[in-house]
Amino acid sequence: MDDQNKNLILATALSFLVILVWFILFPPPEQTEAPATEIATTNGTAVQTPTAAATEGGAGEVPALDSAAPTQAEAPRVQIDTPRLKGSVSLLGGRIDELSLKDYRVSLDEDAEIVEMLTPAGSTSAYYALYGWAPGAGLNAADVPGPLTEWSLESGDTLSVGTPVTLSWSNGSGVTFRRTLAVDEDYMFTVTQSVENGSAAPIGAAPYGILARHGIGEDADLPGLKNFFILHEGVVAMNDGTLSEIDYKDVRKFDIDPNEGAQAEVFQNKSDGWIGFTDHYWMATLIPGSGTAFKSAAKYDARRKIYQAETVLPTMSVAPGESAEVTTRLFAGAKEWESIRAYQQDGVQKFLDSIDWGWFFFLTKPIFWLLHQINGLIGNMGWSIIGLTLIIKAIVFPLALKSYVSMAKMKELQPQMEALKEAAGDDRQKMQQGMMELYKKEKVNPAAGCLPILLQIPIFFSLYKVIFVTIELRQAPWFGPFRDLSMPDPTSIMNFFGWLPWAGPEAGSLTATILIGILPLLLGISMWLQQKLNPAPTDPTQAMIFAWMPWVFMFMLGSFASGLVVYWIANNTITFTQQYIIMRSHGYKPDVFGNIKSGFARRAKADKK
């Protein structure tokens, strides 16, 4: 067996096996968005609010707040209106519980609704941010604002960029609480909570923030989740530089924490951190001020099917006639790289790690950064992927050059190798020994041909991860029918790639996998042409593997994101060009058309037999 073909087949087979196992175990998930919120009365809408003692290891209280569900929709509201957000703040509890993202729609349809980020209690799968004060010395639960407190609008009208609003509430005992909300041009809210002690005695209270998310049904399901192996959905937290990721299913498995009175996992932060919930493209995060010690916790209320993320700051003591305030932040929006990076530069510790870069983060991060920079210049993600491929091929070219030169030398040595085989006869040991001596003498590495293929495996999976998790690829168009590079090729042989007046098969169906689109077809052709740089192997087994490999890959990758298939086509095309030029420059002229012709001739001859 030709050593070069043997190694090439082994490398190709390994790539095929890795992708096949991945495809079988973790098929591409259906690309679904969270449905529009339907208003419905939902039982069990209570959230667990901490007490000041909870910051010092004491037990928290779980007030009965079921009455909040039917009243939230009727409560007075303060509108939120920015270039990128719209929604409202409920004066019942001062909740930020209605928020939509103006720049994103649930689908590519022209009349598709914009994405809802937060929804009030009483809606399907409610999701909201709640702030308050846990009572300490001199106060009880009725003396501090909680989830059902009726706040008054003290100043401001509509919460917008540069126009904050202030809410106030007095407890009737001389203590006044205020909450000032501000929002920037993207997705960050600034929440300033203050307390003014007009009573005759000192008081203590601990400011807290809560993100609450209500599950549906017995399993506490959350609509719109992908539930896909390579994607983290659930709690994401940064604790003094250490990232923690806890899937929703694992949150439901928490042990009861006696200090919290609930299923919980608690983190003690010395100076920096944040905690929240992350989905495929969207995230809500509580961010205390940098340099502040605080406690954060992820909780699950099994009875009410509520997931919670909370931060509790140390108890603040306020003397009579004095006041105190604390400022924290809330991120609620899309996980855009530019926005997240800007917030990280503004002091949110390692905020870019909230994007799920995966196991190959050392590759996915630079690959996305490079793709993002190219897209900033070109303005089209499809052409940017091709540009990225060119740059990657240029980076690995020194290694590829050695491989292609070695392959060319192997072709030059073909007559000597055939002579060794004839001289050795059936003595395989003698033949192998002679081959090794020949390789050593001519300084040829017979395994060099597999290196370019093996290099593609980590790059392929890293780019797959980038295309799947980054919102910049969501609904990113290329040209013509390719309106979303994060989705499979929408074209099909069934309607001759859109030229015939009927619809193609439904995306993700078996029919769509069989009646492939134009991109998978080009992928198969590009792999087939790349094979034709060399004559077909004389060994029948090798020849059969080579013959089937391009078309198997074509159908396998047909259901992958079209952006990934574009990368593979570009990679094959560049590899073909590089290999052709290098092999010619070293004295071996690939006879592509001759190899194609001989392949058909050999097949016709086999059919006659």
Curated annotation (Swiss-Prot):
Q: Which residues form a coiled coil?
A: none
Q: What exactly does this protein do?
A: Required for the insertion and/or proper folding and/or complex formation of integral membrane proteins into the membrane. Involved in integration of membrane proteins that insert both dependently and independently of the Sec translocase complex, as well as at least some lipoproteins. Aids folding of multispanning membrane proteins.
Where it mainly occurs, coarsely classed, is: membrane
Location(s) in or outside the cell: Cell inner membrane
The species this protein was found in: Ruegeria pomeroyi (strain ATCC 700808 / DSM 15171 / DSS-3)
Q: What is this protein called?
A: Membrane protein insertase YidC
GO biological-process terms attached to the record: protein insertion into membrane; protein transport
Residue ranges spanning the membrane: these are 8-28, 381-401, 451-471, 509-529, 545-565
Q: How does this polypeptide assemble, per the annotation?
A: Interacts with the Sec translocase complex via SecD. Specifically interacts with transmembrane segments of nascent integral membrane proteins during membrane integration.
Domain of life from the UniProt record: Bacteria
Q: Which GO terms describe its molecular function?
A: membrane insertase activity
The record gives the membrane topology as: Multi-pass membrane protein
